[in-house]
């Protein structure tokens, strides 16, 4: 699944240009840390691992920029707590 990179995250559009999946982040006072603050997936895509793929895209992008992620949205908080493979990018580890 392909996502479009935006100024503050990644999105998936449907054929009409409507956002059907999105993960966003905001910058912090520390230029090496961003806050993952919002993840949403349209009900038509739920159960397909789309939120995880969005998070993977964000993690890859931030890793390439040598930045860490602080989890704020409930989905990312849960993933960071449950999966230690994210420890390398987790700003709170």
Language model regions located:
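Active-site rim helix/loop that mediates acceptor-substrate recognition in acyltransferases
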Residues: 1-10
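Conserved beta-hairpin
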Residues: 9-20
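Conserved beta-strand in the GNAT
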Residues: 18-26, 35
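A conserved beta-turn-beta hairpin within the catalytic core of GNAT-like acetyltransferases
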Residues: 28-36, 68
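A short, internal acetyl-CoA/4′-phosphopantetheine-binding micro-motif in the GNAT/acyltransferase core
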Residues: 39-46
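Conserved acetyl-CoA-binding loop-helix of GNAT-fold acetyltransferases
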Residues: 47-58
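C-terminal structural segments of small proteins and small subunits
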Residues: 61-93
């Amino acid at each position: 699944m392909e996502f479009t990179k935006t100024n503050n995250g990644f999105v998936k559009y449907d054929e009409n240009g409507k956002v059907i999946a999105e993960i966003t982040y905001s910058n912090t006072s520390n230029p090496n840390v961003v806050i993952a603050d919002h993840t949403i997936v349209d009900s038509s895509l739920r159960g397909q691992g789309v939120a995880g793929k969005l998070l993977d895209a964000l993690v890859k992008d931030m890793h390439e920029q040598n930045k860490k992620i602080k989890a704020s949205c409930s989905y990312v908080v849960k993933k960071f707590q449950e999966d230690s493979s994210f420890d390398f990018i987790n700003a709170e580890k």
